[in-house]
């Protein structure tokens, strides 16, 4: 399956005890992603043959290419504080990175366009619990030819209390994909998005269940 599109980077803070999500927000414009899972590699041999093998996933990283690292979005996610600075007659607020910052746990998901010789799909990828890491910055002075630098942010993948670390589903339409993605946050698709894709959110075919992943019967979503 070939990938030919990427969009809809969404996130919401997660309550660690209840594993329910807050408001869903856009992280940034999507440019690229790369998932790197951490796996066990334990093996037991006896009588000259492999008897036990453990390759279970224990976590991982996800690198996200984004079009904007808006500090009003990323600073709170990184657990950064704020400081007031006096500038003439004005008092301005600046974000403060500190060695004691503790990033917030969030759920994160996006939609990937995929295509083969038979059909095109919109695939939902959802990570129920991640944290974002402080990221490096770089830039150049203006030159004769424009050379745009876009940021890359890295998330650390965690499992929920039941061990779930990722959900995905291949959908036939963008509206179905949005419905699944918002359902995994425990939400419904905003009306303006539903109208943009030509249907109402209260349609029986597109209205997602208002449940969070740990409480949702995922057979309904992943079959």
Please give the residue ranges for each predicted region.
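Hydrophobic membrane-targeting and insertion signals
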Residues: 2, 220-223
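Solvent-exposed edge beta-strands and adjacent loop segments
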Residues: 1-78, 129-150
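Polar low-complexity intrinsically disordered regions enriched in Ser/Thr and small residues
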Residues: 8, 25, 32, 82-84, ...
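Structured, beta-strand-rich domain cores
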Residues: 54-125
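Mixed-charge, glycine-accented linear interaction segment located at domain edges/termini
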Residues: 130-210, 215-216, 222
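An exposure/low-complexity boundary signal
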Residues: 97-99, 218-221
């Amino acid at each position: 399956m070939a990938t030919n599109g990427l969009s809809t980077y969404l996130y919401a803070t997660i309550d660690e005890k209840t594993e329910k999500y807050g408001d869903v927000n856009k992280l940034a414009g999507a440019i690229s992603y790369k998932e790197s899972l951490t796996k066990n590699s334990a093996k037991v041999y006896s009588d000259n043959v492999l008897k036990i093998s453990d390759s279970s996933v224990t976590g991982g990283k996800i690198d996200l290419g984004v079009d904007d690292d808006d500090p009003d979005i990323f600073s709170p996610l990184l657990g950064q504080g704020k400081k007031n600075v006096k500038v003439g007659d004005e008092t301005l607020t600046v974000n403060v990175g500190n060695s004691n910052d503790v990033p917030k746990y969030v759920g994160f998901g996006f939609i990937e366009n995929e295509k083969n010789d038979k059909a095109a799909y919109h695939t939902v990828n959802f990570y129920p619990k991640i944290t974002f890491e402080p990221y490096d910055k770089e830039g150049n002075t203006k030159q004769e030819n424009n050379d745009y630098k876009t940021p890359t942010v890295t998330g650390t993948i965690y499992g929920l209390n039941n061990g779930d670390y990722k959900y995905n589903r291949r959908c036939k339409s963008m509206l179905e994909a949005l419905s699944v993605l918002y359902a995994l946050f425990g939400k419904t698709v905003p009306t303006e998005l539903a109208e943009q894709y030509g249907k109402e959110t209260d349609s029986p075919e597109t209205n997602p269940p208002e449940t969070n992943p740990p409480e949702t019967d995922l057979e309904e979503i992943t079959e």
